[in-house]
A protein has these predicted regions:
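Extracellular adhesion/carbohydrate-binding repeat motifs centered on closely spaced tryptophans
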Residues: 1-57
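Well-ordered beta-strand positions in beta-sheet-rich domains
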Residues: 3, 10, 22, 33, ...
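Intrinsic-disorder/low-complexity loop/linker signature
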Residues: 8, 29-30, 40, 80, ...
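Short, flexible beta-strand-to-coil junctions
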Residues: 8, 15-16, 38-39, 63-67, ...
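Exported/periplasmic cell-wall-interacting domains
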Residues: 114-233
Length: 233
């Protein structure tokens, strides 16, 4: 009975059988509305499974610093809560505690490429699919670092460091996930997608997500983020 992991998939066993379809299930102290496929495996990416219509749904992007996990939760009109786990992924958060201000914000403007010059090192870096977290001092959600404005200029070490406190103000995620957030905001318009910064040690609906369970680290010298849609062409 309860949650089971098998072959990289996650199931919920009730009365000796895995749940199928939509179900309210408890995880890490909260109840969420999960979707399980016909074989009973939890569908961990509702956007990929159900298509673009899900990118237009009311949602909150929860950024959890202690667990280095982003949980995208959809609004449930029946419970009046953001309790539908759409996707969870690994993140790098700011090094300084003061640069990560907890609270509720909105995602506003977007940039296909964002450049940032570190005030300490004076080094300029480039990031793909950047979305501004309005209300924070300077945070954006974007890809890992690039050494030039090119999809083939990935700073592979920063990709491999996903899942730590290593950024200045921003929230770094895999390129494919940065684009997902960027696209959701594109569909919904500025200020419609909510974002929450949390310092809670409680894990979310999919637990702690790491680079190890997100495709693993890339080889030294890798030039493209493996999750980048451009890498799949």
């Amino acid at each position: 009975e309860g949650w089971r992991e098998s072959g990289g998939k996650r199931y919920y066993i009730k009365n000796g059988a895995p749940l199928v379809g939509w179900h309210y299930v408890k995880c890490n102290g909260s109840t969420y509305y999960y979707y399980f496929d016909k074989d009973g495996a939890q569908v961990k990416d509702l956007f990929a499974h159900f298509g673009k219509s899900y990118m237009k749904k009311k949602m909150v992007v929860n950024v959890n610093r202690p667990n280095h996990t982003v949980d995208m939760l959809l609004y449930n009109s029946k419970t009046k809560k953001y309790d539908i786990p759409a996707k969870s992924f690994v993140t790098t958060t700011p090094e300084e505690n003061a640069h990560f201000k907890t609270g509720s914000y909105k995602l506003t403007y977007r940039r296909r490429w964002w450049s940032f010059t570190n005030p300490d090192s004076k080094k300029t870096s480039y990031y793909q699919y950047a979305t501004r977290v309005q209300g924070t001092y300077g945070a954006l959600i974007h890809s890992s670092r690039y050494t030039a404005k090119s999809v083939k200029a990935l700073a592979w070490k920063t990709y491999n460091n996903l899942g730590a406190n290593r950024s200045y103000y921003c929230i770094r995620v895999q390129c494919g996930n940065a684009k997902l957030i960027y696209d959701c905001v594109g569909y919904q318009g500025s200020g419609k997608v909510l974002c929450k910064f949390s310092n809670s040690k409680t894990k979310g609906p999919n637990g702690k997500v790491t680079i190890a369970n997100s495709g693993g680290k890339v080889k030294a010298g890798t030039k493209m983020d493996p999750t980048d849609p451009a890498a799949k062409k």
